């Protein structure tokens, strides 16, 4: 069985983002999403017009691999190094990502039935886990078709 960690993260996140954009109507960028920054030390909003779906797919992957997690833990997961000081010459510091974007995405994923909330934070529902597993298996099959030496890492097709 192919798991999420068996396929490249960038390919998986792009495919899940495309699926969310096309098939999950509950996950939509709010009106303020086109002018919001993703962290306090960022100077501009993201350049990718579909960044909301990419971040939602990335949150799903992080919950699959490291869940359950809350907004604070995900803020730390999306943190970045920032230059500080008047002339930006002091050593860099870690800055946590903004919480509003992550919180709103988690709320939308809850409405879609892909994430559930409990006392330990948010975790994937069985539907969310099976969605990621199905997309990962599809990606693994496509990669194995492109590079036959990867066949040994995928399960044989049923009926053979």
Say what each PLM segment does.
Residues 79, 107, 133, 137:
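Residue-level detection of the helix-turn-helix DNA-binding "recognition helix"
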Residues 25-27, 49, 76, 94, ...:
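Long, charge-rich, low-complexity intrinsically disordered regions
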Residues 107-120:
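A short, conserved structural fragment
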Residues 126-160:
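Short, amphipathic alpha-helical interaction segments positioned at domain boundaries
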Residues 58-66, 77:
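Short amphipathic alpha-helical elements of helix-turn-helix/winged-helix folds
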Residues 1-57, 61:
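Long, low-complexity, charged/polar intrinsically disordered regions in eukaryotic proteins
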Residues 71, 102-107:
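Short, hydrophobic-biased segments on the C-terminal half of alpha helices
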Residues 68-93:
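Short acidic, hydrophobic short linear motifs in intrinsically disordered regions
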